[in-house]
């Protein structure tokens, strides 16, 4: 037998009147006796404070305040304490014989509110020898002690071995420890529980019975039946969750298309934009690279154009310079042609004038002949006149010189005179004044030489005179010819000039004969020179074009090299054309192949996506279509196996559900018919009687009753007989046992207990051996244990069934997916990767484009080289035939030489043409020019002068000779005086002189007459000469003009000049044409350069913009990619098949999806705002944010208990798998969970019956309690009429109200409330909701009305009311009810506490003087029977016979108030025994 825990003592430390007082508590009744103010209430207040340290509940008021709602300001606690640390401790010993000290530390808090600080604590393991006062006080001396604060107490206890000190921060923890150690009867989990406990203590403290206590008895006595309520709540929660899940499934099913539409459109909207940006980024990169390539190409082209422009500008400058020269040359040639034409006209004039001159020449010659004859006659006349003159002069000379001396003296005198005269004459003749006879010899030699010279000259003149005399008539003609040829000249120069002219004429005729050959030679040479110059120009141009200077010797080798190069380049160009055609053809084939692959790529990608999904779903890798078909066969086999296993698990789960349902029946009845039969027979099921049997005893009782464990216990079997007749609705074996259901025991059988078995002796000749079942089902604990294990098994089976169902659905879906894959994609799924091939082909295409570009460049270079080589060969073909000309360095000199010779020859020809006739005429008569007839007189005079000079020289020589010879005569000076003259000879000479003078006069007259005629002839000659001279001057002027013109006016000159002009005009035209071509090409080149410059600027701008855009887009794209990867949506957005769509298609796709999304998210403000923000084309990351928001929204919409994934797409894929299975499963679960209204009514009724039976059992303990006229006390439990009607309708007429219970919109509680309102329309439900009302209706306590009844005197059983009972009767009745409550709490909490603990029982009773002695004795008896402790506060005149009594007397000693305590145990005739410590002297705090 388990001993009940007891309170051993109460210790008060530093309370008002109690410094350190320990009250030992009696095992039954402890009485505090004393007068008013003795400290009885303070003591019980200290006990209650230690028991319930909750300041919100503690309210110690006097009994006069019993009905007050508020007491003193401090609720009676602050005034019961003294300043400083105070303690209230309870020393207990529990059923395990463990000593536990619990208490509180109290301390007043200064302030107007008069608050008290409370700290609960507990001490375990304290030795029995240690008193509580020793723990919390410290003795200072014999009369002084100090109260230890809590921290010192803690340190003190921690120093004691085996002692545990616990300080609590919450009252719940404090009460939890007290409940676990068996100090209090009920676990006080909340403030409500503490309030109930305090109200119980308070009711016992102040005693009496009230309507408040009566109303709250249901809360105190009737257990909450949390299991049933929780079952209902769990059922409703499960049903609610089930219905919510079904509703969510239905919403999900209805939203599935919306989900699909939303995720599809969101994916299309974002993925299209994502792939468009990806494509655009790739396009932009390609464009940037293309721009860069074009930029480099354009720069190269611009540089080439600039070089070309420079070359063309240089060539244009050369052509401009050459054009100026050619224009000058052409102008010069034109001028030359004009000059030639002018010269030809001049030549014609010259020829006309020459003809006129020839005619005038003839006339002039005739006139000259006439004049010559006249001149001859005139000369004859002059000769005669001159002869006459000479004769006169001779005579005069002779007259002067004639003297002779006849004798020697005279001779010597004459010789001397002659010598002197000779000397004087020699001096005079020789003009030598200093001449002497001695120097004469020397001068003689000199004058002899002069004489010799004069003689030779005289002889020459003499010859001339002789010739002149013979050709006197032809001289004028020859002279005129010489003058006509040579021009005016001295007549004496005519002979020399004529001879020179004749020699020159011969040369000129010879030269003139060479004009035509020279002209032909010059024309040939000039042609060769022009060809040489053209060849040099071609060579220079060729060298310039070749960029290298070549020697003439290298040209032939270069020609051969160029011919070979042309042949090779021609072959290369031909091969290049073929190669280019092959490359083009391959490129077109590649392009066609790429196009076909690009068309096939989306289909292949779709097939690959499907294949990858299948691979991910099944975890297999498929390399061929055969693998797919083989796996499909395996999948079918796996599906069959999974279906078989699922059906097996489902069958087992159904069996478990049925067993759980059977075991969950109220009262342990496994057959519903037994409940009906028990109710019909007025009995109770045996399983219901043993419903509270423990789990350990369940196997024994199960084996004890065996098959009759489902028997019905009836009070009288005889009354059941009539009900058995015609009974068909019952089990095959129905056991009936006679007995009192309220006091049934197992004494009906004779039992022998064996090891894990029993032998039941049913009769003398019938025994039954029953082993203890391994899984007992007898009793609620066993059933609950079994149900718990079945629930665990059911959870495993449900999970396995769900897993298998999901696997089956997944396998079926996978089978369908494989079937769709085989039907749609199997043909292309295992083909080669078109994208890889596209990449290879693109790489090959790039190589081909590069090869084509290189080939084009090489071909262009080869073409340029070919053209250059052809031009070089063409130029060389024009140059090579002229190599000899290029090698002829002397050609120009020869041309100049020939031109000079031609000029000379032409001059000679013109001379011969002009003077040929004159020279022909002059040649026969040139000799006549040796003496000029007009100078005959002069010649004669010259001759005479020559003679004279000869004579003078001779005379001088003679005179000198004479002087030299007469050197001896100078000695005859004496003889000179003797000289005398003779005048006779002079006279004769004078006469002859006169005759000669007369003759001279006549000759002169004849001369004058003939001179006049000669003058006339000369005048005619002068007129002819004047005309001739005029013509001659004009001819000379024309010839000078012709010479000034400087051209050769021959017959081919005009043609050559015209040819030369035409050649120059052709060259000028060619030059101008080339210049125009160059100007046009230069303009085109400049335009091309401008275009290239603009293009280059545009390309640079586009390139830098594109580069900046690429860099900017790269940052944005990195943010987008980071966001995509962080949120794990790359697989959803990077749809490779979209890469093959154009930007317009993707934009159209995104716009269409945007329109659909606007409608789809119109009702969702968040998504609508995010979608609106995502429409910004400059912020692509916002579309990703929208996509993530859609995913998040869908994740939130997806129930994780339905779909176990965070990916909405996978959720949608799993949704279709799960929805049908979940719908079916949840529907069946709802049917299983949904308890019937009849079952609810039976549960509530059975619970009510059980509690009524329990109350009846509690009432048995109160049958012998009496107070005054109260003979007995009992609790009467009745079902309320309205609720009874509800139960009847639920059990009998539930089919009429199935509209409420079958509604999916109403929970069971709400349906129950609606039914209650329907049955009781007169009841006002107030503001309570149907759910709240339904939950109250599911609590059986609300069905019951509990009343306290007393059997009082002759009135019989009456309702216990304070007005009908005396104070003592009311106190006794209330105490009885409180004892019942405590016992009920213990029974209720028995399963929550250890089985080896029986809690302490203690109640209070203040002012017990209101009870008489009999009532007090009854309380003593009740306490003894119920093992309950009671603390009573009684006045001094109460002296109980049993228990312990403390007499308290409050005294004042030296202004200090204290309570004097004396304890007595057992007030009987024997001497009172003084309790230990009763004589303790009053003490004061130090």
UniProtKB/Swiss-Prot annotation:
GO terms for cellular component: cytoplasm; nucleoid. Residues 326-418, 444-480, 509-603, 835-923, 977-1115, 1209-1266 form a coiled coil. The keyword Transmembrane helix does not apply. It is found in: Cytoplasm, Nucleoid. It comes from the Bacteria. InterPro entries: MukB, MukB/SMC, MukB_hinge, MukB_hinge_sf, MukB_N_dom, P-loop_NTPase. Its main location: cytoplasm. Keywords: ATP-binding, Cell cycle, Cell division, Chromosome partition, Coiled coil, Cytoplasm, DNA condensation, DNA-binding, Nucleotide-binding. ATP binds at residues 34-41. The keyword Nuclease does not apply. Homodimerization via its hinge domain. Binds to DNA via its C-terminal region. Interacts, and probably forms a ternary complex, with MukE and MukF via its C-terminal region. The complex formation is stimulated by calcium or magnesium. Interacts with tubulin-related protein FtsZ. Plays a central role in chromosome condensation, segregation and cell cycle progression. Functions as a homodimer, which is essential for chromosome partition. Involved in negative DNA supercoiling in vivo, and by this means organize and compact chromosomes. May achieve or facilitate chromosome segregation by condensation DNA from both sides of a centrally located replisome during cell division. Belongs to the SMC family. MukB subfamily. This is Chromosome partition protein MukB.
């Amino acid at each position: 037998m388990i001993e009940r825990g007891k309170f051993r003592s109460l210790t008060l430390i530093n309370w008002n009147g109690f410094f350190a007082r320990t009250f030992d508590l009696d095992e039954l009744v402890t009485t505090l006796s004393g007068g008013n103010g003795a400290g009885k209430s303070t003591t019980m207040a200290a006990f209650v404070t230690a028991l319930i340290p909750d300041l919100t509940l503690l309210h110690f008021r006097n009994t006069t305040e019993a009905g007050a709602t508020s007491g003193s300001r401090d609720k009676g606690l602050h005034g019961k304490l003294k300043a400083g640390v105070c303690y209230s401790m309870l020393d207990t010993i529990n059923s395990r014989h463990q000593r536990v000290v619990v208490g509180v530390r109290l301390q007043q808090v200064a302030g107007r509110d008069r608050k008290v600080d409370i700290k609960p604590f507990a001490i375990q393991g304290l030795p029995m020898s240690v008193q509580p006062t020793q723990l919390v006080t410290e003795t200072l001396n014999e009369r002084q002690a100090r109260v230890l604060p809590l921290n010192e107490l803690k340190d003190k206890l921690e120093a004691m071995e085996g002692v545990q000190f616990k300080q609590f921060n919450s009252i719940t923890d404090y009460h939890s420890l007290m409940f676990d150690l068996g100090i209090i009867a009920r676990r006080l989990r909340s403030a409500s529980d503490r309030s109930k406990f305090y109200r119980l203590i308070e009711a016992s403290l102040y005693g009496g019975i009230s309507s408040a206590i009566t109303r709250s008895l249901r809360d105190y006595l009737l257990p909450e039946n949390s299991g049933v309520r929780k079952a209902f709540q769990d059922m409703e929660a499960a049903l609610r969750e089930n219905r919510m899940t079904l509703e969510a499934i239905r919403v999900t099913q209805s939203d599935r298309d919306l989900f699909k539409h939303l995720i599809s459109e969101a994916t299309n909207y974002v993925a299209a934009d994502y792939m468009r940006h990806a494509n655009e980024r790739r396009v932009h990169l390609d464009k940037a690279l293309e721009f860069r390539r074009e930029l480099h190409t354009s720069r190269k082209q611009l540089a080439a154009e600039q070089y070309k422009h420079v070359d063309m500008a240089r060539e244009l400058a050369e052509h401009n310079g050459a054009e100026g020269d050619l224009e000058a040359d052409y102008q010069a040639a034109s001028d030359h042609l004009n000059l030639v034409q002018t010269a030809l006209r001049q030549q014609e004039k010259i020829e006309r004038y020459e003809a006129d001159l020839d005619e005038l020449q003839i006339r002039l010659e005739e006139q000259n002949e006439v004049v010559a004859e006249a001149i001859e006659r005139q000369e004859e006349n002059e000769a005669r006149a001159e002869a006459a003159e000479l004769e006169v002069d001779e005579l005069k000379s002779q007259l002067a010189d004639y003297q002779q001396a006849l004798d020697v003296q005279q001779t010597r005198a004459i010789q001397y005179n002659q010598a002197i005269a000779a000397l004087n004459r020699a001096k005079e003749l020789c003009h030598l004044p200093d001449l002497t006879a001695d120097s004469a010899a020397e001068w003689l030699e000199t004058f002899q030489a002069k004489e010799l010279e004069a003689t030779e000259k005289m002889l020459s003149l003499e010859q001339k005179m002789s010739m002149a005399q013979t050709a006197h008539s032809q001289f004028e003609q020859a002279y005129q010819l010489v003058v006509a040829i040579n021009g005016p000249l001295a007549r004496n120069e005519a002979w020399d000039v004529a001879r020179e002219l004749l020699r020159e004429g011969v040369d000129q005729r010879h030269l003139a004969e060479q004009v035509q050959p020279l002209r032909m030679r010059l024309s040939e040479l000039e042609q060769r020179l022009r060809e040489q110059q053209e060849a040099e120009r071609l060579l220079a141009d060729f060298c310039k074009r070749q960029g290298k200077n070549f020697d003439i010797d290298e040209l032939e080798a270069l020609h051969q090299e160029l011919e070979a190069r042309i042949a090779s380049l021609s072959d290369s160009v031909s091969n290049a054309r073929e190669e280019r055609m092959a490359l083009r053809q391959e490129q077109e084939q590649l392009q066609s192949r790429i196009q076909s692959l690009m068309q096939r790529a989306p289909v292949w990608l779709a097939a690959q996506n499907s294949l990858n999904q299948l691979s991910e779903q099944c975890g297999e890798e498929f390399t061929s279509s055969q693998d797919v078909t083989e796996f499909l066969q395996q999948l079918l086999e796996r599906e069959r196996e999974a279906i078989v296993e699922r059906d097996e698990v489902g069958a087992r789960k159904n069996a478990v559900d049925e067993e759980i349902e059977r075991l969950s029946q109220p009262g342990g009845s496994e057959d519903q018919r037994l409940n009906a039969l028990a109710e019909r027979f007025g009995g109770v099921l045996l399983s219901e009687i043993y419903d509270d049997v423990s789990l350990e005893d369940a196997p024994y009782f199960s084996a004890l009753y065996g098959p009759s464990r489902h028997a019905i216990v009836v009070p009288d079997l005889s009354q059941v007989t009539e009900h058995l007749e015609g009974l068909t609705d019952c089990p095959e074996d129905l056991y009936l046992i006679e007995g009192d259901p309220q006091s049934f025991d197992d004494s009906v059988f004779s039992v022998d207990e064996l090891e894990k078995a029993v032998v039941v002796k049913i009769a003398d000749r019938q025994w039954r051996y029953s082993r203890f079942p391994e899984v007992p089902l007898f009793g609620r604990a066993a059933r609950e244990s079994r149900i718990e294990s079945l629930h665990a098994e059911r959870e495993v089976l449900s999970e396995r069934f769900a897993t298998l169902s999901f696997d089956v659905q997944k396998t079926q879906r996978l089978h369908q997916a494989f079937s769709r894959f085989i039907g749609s994609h199997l043909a292309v799924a295992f083909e080669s990767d078109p994208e890889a091939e596209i990449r290879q082909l693109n790489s090959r295409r790039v190589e081909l484009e590069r090869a084509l570009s290189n080939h084009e460049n090489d071909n262009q270079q080869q073409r340029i080289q070919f053209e250059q080589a052809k031009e070089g060969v063409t130029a060389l073909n024009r140059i090579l035939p002229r190599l000899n000309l290029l090698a002829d360095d002397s050609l120009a000199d020869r041309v100049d030489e020939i031109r000079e010779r031609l000029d000379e020859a032409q001059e000679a020809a013109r001379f011969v043409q002009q003077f040929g006739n004159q020279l022909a005429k002059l040649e026969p008569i040139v000799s006549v020019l040796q003496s000029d007839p007009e100078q005959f007189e002069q010649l004669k005079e010259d001759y005479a002068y020559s003679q004279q000079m000869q004579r003078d020289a001779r005379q001088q020589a003679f005179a000198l000779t004479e002087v030299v010879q007469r050197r001896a005569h100078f000695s005859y000076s004496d003889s000179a005086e003797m000289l005398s003259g003779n005048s006779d000879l002079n006279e004769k000479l004078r006469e002859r002189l006169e005759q000669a003078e007369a003759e001279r006069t006549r000759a002169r007259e004849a001369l004058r007459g003939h001179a006049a005629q000669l003058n006339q002839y000369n005048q005619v000659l002068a007129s002819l000469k004047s005309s001739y001279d005029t013509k001659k001057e004009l001819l000379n002027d024309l010839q000078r003009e012709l010479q000034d013109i400087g051209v050769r006016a021959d017959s081919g000159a005009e043609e050559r000049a015209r040819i030369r002009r035409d050649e120059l005009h052709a060259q000028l035209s060619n030059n101008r044409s080339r210049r125009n071509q160059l100007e046009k090409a230069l303009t085109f080149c400049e335009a091309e350069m401008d275009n290239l410059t603009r293009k280059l600027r545009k390309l640079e701008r586009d390139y830098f913009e594109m580069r900046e855009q690429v860099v900017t887009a790269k940052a944005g794209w990195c943010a987008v990619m980071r966001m995509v990867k962080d949120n794990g949506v790359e697989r959803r957005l990077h749809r490779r098949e979209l890469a093959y769509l154009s930007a317009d298609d993707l934009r159209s796709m995104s716009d269409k999806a945007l329109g659909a999304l606007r409608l789809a998210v119109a009702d969702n403000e968040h998504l609508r705002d995010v979608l609106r923000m995502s429409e910004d084309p400059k912020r692509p990351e916002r579309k990703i944010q929208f996509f993530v928001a859609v995913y998040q929204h869908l994740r939130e919409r997806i129930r994780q208990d339905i779909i176990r994934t965070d990916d909405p797409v996978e959720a949608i894929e799993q949704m279709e798998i799960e929805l049908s299975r979940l719908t079916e499963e949840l529907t069946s679960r709802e049917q299983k969970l949904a308890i019937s209204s009849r079952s609810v009514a039976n549960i509530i009724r059975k619970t009510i019956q059980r509690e009524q039976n329990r109350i009846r059992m509690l009432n048995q303990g109160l049958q012998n309690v009496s107070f005054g006229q109260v003979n007995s006390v009992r609790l009467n439990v009745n079902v309320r009429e309205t609720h009874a009607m509800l139960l009847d309708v639920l059990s009998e007429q539930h089919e009429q109200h199935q509209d409420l219970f079958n509604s999916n919109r109403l929970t069971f509680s709400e349906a129950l409330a609606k039914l209650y309102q329907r049955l009781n329309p007169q009841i006002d439900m107030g503001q309570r909701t149907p759910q709240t009302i339904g939950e109250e209706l599911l609590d059986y306590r609300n069905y019951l009305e509990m009343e306290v009844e007393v059997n009082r005197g002759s009135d019989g059983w009456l309702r216990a009311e304070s007005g009908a009972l005396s104070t003592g009767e009311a106190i006794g009745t209330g105490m009885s009810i409180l004892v019942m409550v405590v016992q009920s709490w213990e029974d209720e909490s028995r399963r929550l506490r250890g089985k080896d603990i029986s809690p302490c029982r203690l109640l209070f009773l203040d002012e017990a003087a209101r009870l008489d002695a009999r009532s007090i004795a009854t309380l003593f008896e009740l306490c003894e029977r119920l093992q309950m402790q009671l603390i009573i506060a009684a006045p001094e005149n109460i002296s109980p016979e049993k228990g312990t009594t403390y007499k308290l007397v409050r005294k004042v000693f030296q202004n200090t108030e204290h309570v004097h305590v004396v304890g007595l145990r057992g007030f009987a005739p024997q001497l009172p025994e003084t309790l230990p410590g009763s004589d303790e002297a009053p003490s004061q705090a130090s």
